[in-house]
């Protein structure tokens, strides 16, 4: 699937994360499907009611990038970011072409986001507007809930520590 539609694969990984958290955590999938599918949040703390506070909201994101966090909105709340890599040769782990190598959990306020604009316009294509976390490496420092110890970031990509 990744090689056919790279642009939607991160959404797919984020959806799998949402489903996993719904089944094993204090968070449940947002039952308001129009919000969950297009806006915010993906998950809400069980029992938090129809209008949860930002502290009860959890958005599931996935990225192949080691630091960037992007969203279509700059909502305040909790974010879980599944950092994954594609290993076509399956040399890191046999039979595993997709590896989640780090999971970041961070509370972000609206002010933590910066507007990144859009190339979309009447003349043709382009992305819809997005927001990115300002200074993501600094904001995510120490926020890894899970991190593989056999990988490191080199030249902006996760690689095996013994990689030359």
Spans of model-derived segments:
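Nucleic-acid endonuclease domains
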Residues: 1-40, 44-56, 62-164
């Amino acid at each position: 699937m990744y090689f056919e539609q790279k642009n939607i694969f991160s959404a797919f990984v984020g959806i799998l994360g949402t489903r996993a958290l719904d089944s094993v955590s204090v968070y449940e999938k947002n039952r308001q499907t129009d919000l969950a599918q297009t806006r915010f949040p993906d998950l809400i703390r069980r029992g938090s009611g129809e209008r949860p506070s930002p502290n009860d909201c959890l958005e599931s994101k996935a990225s192949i990038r080691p630091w960037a966090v992007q969203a279509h909105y700059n909502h305040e709340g909790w974010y879980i970011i599944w950092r994954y890599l594609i290993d076509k040769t399956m040399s890191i782990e046999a039979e595993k072409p997709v590896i989640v190598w780090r999971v970041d959990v961070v509370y972000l306020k609206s002010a933590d986001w910066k507007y990144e604009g859009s190339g979309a316009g009447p003349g043709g294509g382009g992305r819809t507007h997005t927001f990115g976390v300002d200074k993501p490496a600094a904001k995510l420092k120490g926020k890894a809930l899970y991190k593989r110890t056999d990988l490191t970031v080199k030249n902006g990509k996760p690689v095996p520590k013994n990689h030359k």
